[in-house]
From Swiss-Prot:
This is Receptor-like protein 31. Coiled coil: none annotated. Belongs to the RLP family. Residues 1-23 form the signal peptide. InterPro entries: Leu-rich_rpt, Leu-rich_rpt_typical-subtyp, LRR_dom_sf, LRR_N_plant-typ, LRR_R13L4/SHOC2-like. Residues 831-860 are cytoplasmic. SUPFAM superfamilies: L domain-like. Residues 24-809 are extracellular. The chain crosses the membrane at residues 810-830. Glycans are attached at residues 49, 64, 88, 95, 112, 117, 154, 178, 202, 213, 313, 346, 364, 429, 482, 503, 516, 642, 673, 697, 745, 765. It is found in: Cell membrane. The keyword Transmembrane applies. Its main location: membrane.
Length: 860
């Protein structure tokens, strides 16, 4: 007979064993109807890859009848009822749409449904509303289109609704107000539009609201005080308007508020708040239309870590009061109209400061010595202001400083050598004229980016720069350096990506130092006095995208060997002494990646075979075709460093003696300029293959024969100059259909027959057709008031006196926009804070002058 204690032990053991058996999904089979519904759902996606070799989070290889469905990957069953309560197929490539009668909707007991990153497309079926027990619905990172169905309101138990990064459109349904248990609403990166429904105010349990990067408009709800649990509020990059919703900042739990990139206006006003949010840590109000002064009430947010008020219309003086906030780490005031001196005072309470950006304002006076009290400072951006004087010695005390941007000010004097320990030094467009103690401390240099362009430096090229062995980008353009380029620059060629020395007085040959320059993207030595030949070591620059040697005295055969560089997009040899033929039968034609080529005003000769342009694939590939150019690939159109900003490049046009500069070369610019040489023979018929060509200048040569009919295929052509040749025959009537062509010149040839009667032709000046006696149909074009005398044509290569009738399209080398340099690094520190794909947004900003960008959080 058992003693009582033994009986109790046996009883509890049996009960525990029974409960364990009941709860174990592996010991209890799932219901047949659940299994069949799952298999039906699986069979709706016949192209799903079930290979275990593919590193997806879940595969469907385990979904077969020989295995209990509660053990299938991604499936979770209730321990008692064996109903499927969770389905997580994240990253399984379903590659199909959700069908309205899908087996998925037979799983009536689902609580959690995660189909993120499954390559789903098509509409969200309204039958999704049948899964009324859902508490979590995640359809993020797919290609879903259409509107959110009103049946979403049936999911009244939802606490998490995530539709991030799809292609959904239209207004949100009013039924969304039925989701009264919702805590996480994530609709960012879609195309939603219209107003926020009034029923949105029912969602009082919300912790996170993320509507970032849509097209919502109108005003935000005036009263948001009902969202007492709200922690994260992100409506950035929409079209909301009106004034700042003050009630938002009375929510005591609010920690993160992002309203940037909208059309809010009026003053930034926090007054009359009974209970300011003491938890607020991140406030982003940039890229709106706020005006007036920065309110001193901001200083009441004593937990504030990051404040971004950039690119508004704020006025007033420097907001010294901000620097009383002890937790403040980042302040961005760039792109406003703030004036006066910068005065920090004795504000050591803000010792946490890591980032200060006051660029593009109207601050003046000296840079304050007191900035040195912020010992944790990593970035200091003061570009585009009116600062004067010299760089304060006290800044050298900032041991953690990495990025120092002072472009476009009125600074003078010497550049101190302690700057070389930083990562980035950008001092362009000032009046610096010397270097202090340049050789000291260079063995410990860390500088990777050095921009000394557009200052007053003169004399021989400084050899001490060769000791900056970590350099990646060196910009010394637009100064008065003379003498030769030192061969010792080879010391950092292994790391260099950009070497910009244009517009100085450098002489001698370009040194043969590029054997190890495998990372070099851009080389610009234009507008100097260089002579000799192009160094053959350039053939090792396999990454090179831009080569500009314009306006020198280089005397060499045309470098057809450059055609083997796989990434060469821009080649500018203009105004040198290159000679010989472009086409060399023994060499590969190459130049498959060229987008801009300018060999004008040289001494090139010979004929071009009819197939000459047939290998120029980049100019023949229509935008949007497979493998299309990405902005981030080309420094002349958008050079990226740390995915944070871009260079600005230019295109110049000499028209009737006036040189006009376009401030931006974008990915659509495709240019050929062969003018001012001695090419002869027919214009190659293969020119018609270059479907993307925008500007074609073959003027001032000796081309003969007819104008190729294939030119009519260049539907994107905007400018055509065939003047000063020996062309004969008729102007192809098909050219009249080129609707984008606004500028043309056929003068000084032997053309005959009728001029096309299209609007593009009839709108030209008479001078575009002069000295073609047999042309007819010019009555409307050459009215008496438009007639001009026919000057004797001159074929001089002197760029200072161009003929009035000649249009020379020039793709200039990298014309770095002032202050753009600083933008290249601002996101480097911020990437861990807001985690946005900064670069793609940068090139879609509503404000074209923006040069800085703060990164985004993990979800928008």
């Amino acid at each position: 007979m058992m003693i009582p204690s033994q009986s109790c032990f046996c009883f509890f053991f049996m009960v525990s064993f029974f409960l364990h058996t009941l709860a174990s999904p592996t010991l209890r089979h799932c219901r047949h109807d659940q299994r069949n519904a799952l298999l039906e759902f699986k069979h709706e996606f016949p192209r799903v890859n079930e290979s275990n070799q593919i590193p997806y989070d879940v595969s469907l290889s385990s979904w077969n009848k020989s295995i209990d469905c509660c053990s299938w990957e991604g499936v979770t069953c209730d321990a008692i009822s064996s109903e499927v309560i969770s389905l997580n197929l994240s990253h399984v490539p379903l590659n199909n749409s959700l069908k309205p009668n899908s087996g998925l909707f037979k799983l009536q007991h689902l609580h959690n449904l995660t189909l993120s990153n499954c390559s789903l497309y098509g509409d969200i079926p309204s039958s999704l509303g049948n899964l009324f027990r859902l508490t979590l619905l995640d359809l993020s990172y797919n290609y879903l289109v259409g509107q959110v169905p009103p049946s979403i309101g049936n999911l009244s138990r939802l606490t998490i609704l995530d539709l991030w990064d799809n292609k959904l459109v239209g207004q949100l349904p009013a039924s969304i107000g039925n989701l009264t248990q919702l805590e996480y609403l994530i609709f960012s990166h879609n195309k939603f539009s219209g107003n926020i429904p009034v029923t949105f105010s029912n969602l009082t349990k919300l912790l996170v609201v993320n509507l970032y990067n849509n097209s919502f408009e109108s005003m935000l709800p005036l009263d948001m005080s009902g969202f007492q649990n709200l922690d994260y509020f992100n409506v950035g990059e929409n079209s909301f308007s009106g004034t700042l919703p003050k009630s938002l900042f009375t929510i005591p739990s609010l920690r993160w508020a992002n309203l940037e990139g909208n059309m809010f206006k009026g003053p930034i006003e926090f007054r009359n708040m009974y209970s300011p949010s003491t938890r607020l840590q991140y406030l982003f109000l940039s890229q709106n239309k706020f005006d007036g002064p920065i309110p001193d009430t901001l200083s009441q947010y004593l937990n504030l870590i990051e404040l971004d008020l950039s690119f508004n219309n704020l006025t007033g003086s420097f907001p010294t009061f901000l620097f009383t906030i002890p937790t403040l780490e980042r302040v961005n005031l760039e792109g406003n109209h703030l004036k006066g001196p910068v005065e920090f005072g004795n504000m050591s309470s803000s010792s946490s400061l890591k980032f200060l950006n006051f660029a593009q304002n109207e601050f003046n006076g000296s840079i304050p010595e007191s900035v040195s009290q912020y010992l944790n400072l990593e970035e200091l951006h003061l570009s585009f202001n009116n600062f004067i004087g010299t760089i304060p010695r006290s800044i050298s005390k900032l041991a953690k400083l990495e990025y120092f941007c002072l472009e476009d000010n009125n600074m003078v004097g010497e550049v101190p050598s302690w700057l070389w320990r930083l990562t980035m030094v950008a001092l362009s467009n000032n009046s610096f004229n010397s270097f202090g103690e340049s050789s000291e401390g260079l063995d410990e240099t860390q500088v990777q980016w050095l921009d000394l362009s557009s200052n007053s430096f003169q004399g021989p090229f400084p050899h001490w720069i060769c000791k900056l062995r970590s350099l990646e980008i060196l910009i010394m353009s637009d100064n008065r350096f003379n003498g030769s380029i030192p061969p010792c620059l080879s010391s950092f060629m292994v790391s260099l990506t950009d070497l910009i020395l244009r517009n100085n007085s450098l002489s001698g040959p370009l040194p043969d130092i590029f054997v190890n320059a495998t990372k070099l993207l851009s080389l610009d030595v234009s507008r100097n006095k260089l002579d000799g030949v192009l160094p053959k070591s350039l053939i090792h620059c396999k990454a090179m995208q831009l080569l500009n040697v314009r306006s020198n005295k280089i005397k060499d055969k045309f470098p057809s060997w450059l055609g083997s560089l796989p990434s060469l997009h821009v080649l500018i040899l203009r105004s040198n002494e290159f000679y010989g033929t472009l086409y060399q039968p023994h060499a590969s034609i190459g130049f498959q990646s060229l987008r801009v080529i300018d060999v004008s005003h040289n001494d090139l000769i010979g004929t071009l075979p009819s197939f000459y342009f047939s290998s120029w694939r980049e100019m023949s590939r229509l935008t949007g075709e497979d493998g299309d150019f990405r902005l981030s690939e080309a420094p002349y159109m958008g050079k990226v460093l740390n995915a944070t900003a871009f260079f600005v490049d230019s295109m110049e046009i000499v028209n009737k003696g006036v040189e006009t500069e376009f401030k931006r070369i974008n990915e659509e610019n495709k240019v050929i300029n062969f003018s001012g040489n001695r090419f002869s023979g027919n214009i190659p018929e293969s020119i018609g293959l270059l479907k993307e060509l925008r500007h074609l200048n073959l003027s001032s040569n000796a081309f003969t024969g007819n104008i190729p009919q294939s030119l009519a295929n260049l539907m994107k052509l905007e400018a055509l100059d065939l003047s000063l040749n020996q062309l004969s025959g008729q102007i192809p009537q098909g050219l009249g259909s080129l609707s984008f062509m606004s500028t043309m010149n056929f003068s000084y040839n032997f053309l005959e027959g009728p001029v096309p009667k299209s609007t593009q032709f009839q709108g030209q000046n008479c001078s575009a057709f002069m000295e073609n006696p047999k042309l007819n149909g010019l009555e409307e074009i050459c009215r008496e008031t438009d007639r001009v005398p026919n000057p004797k044509p001159q074929e001089s290569k002197d760029l200072s006196e161009p003929e009035e009738h000649v249009i020379n399209w020039i793709a200039a080398g990298i014309a770095y926009g002032p202050g753009v340099v600083c933008g290249l690094v601002i996101g480097h520190i911020f990437l861990s804070h807001k985690h946005e794909c900064w670069f793609m947004e940068k090139f879609r900003r509503k404000k074209p002058k923006v040069v800085t960008r703060i990164a985004r959080p993990s979800k928008h």
